[in-house]
Amino acid sequence: MLDKTSSQFDSFLFWRQPIPSLDLSELEDLGISAPKSKEMKSTKSFPRQDEDEDRELSKFSTFNFWKEPIPSIDTLDFSLLL
């Protein structure tokens, strides 16, 4: 019979601490505002909108995640790698 108290899901290896909810007051202390709705963005003037977009948090994706550029590789170095 399977003992449910010692199942693999109760193991320390499978347990993960939940991600805490985001406290918006901490963001305000850092000078970052919470993302605003699309309706509020459309009512702003165009030059002011660019300034606000820099301060807002964007949703993480691999597209907007900055990575260090690959340095130029000399052909001799490249042939040594192969």
UniProtKB/Swiss-Prot annotation:
Q: Which UniProt keywords apply?
A: Cytoplasm, Cytoskeleton, Nucleus, Ubl conjugation
Q: Quote the protein name from its UniProt record.
A: Protein AF1q
Extract the PANTHER family matched here. PROTEIN AF1Q
What family does this belong to? Belongs to the MLLT11 family.
Q: Which InterPro entries match?
A: MLLT11_fam, WRNPLPNID
Tell me where in or outside the cell this protein is found. Answer: Nucleus; Cytoplasm; Cytoplasm, Cytoskeleton, Microtubule organizing center, Centrosome
Residue positions of motif Nuclear export signal:
24-32
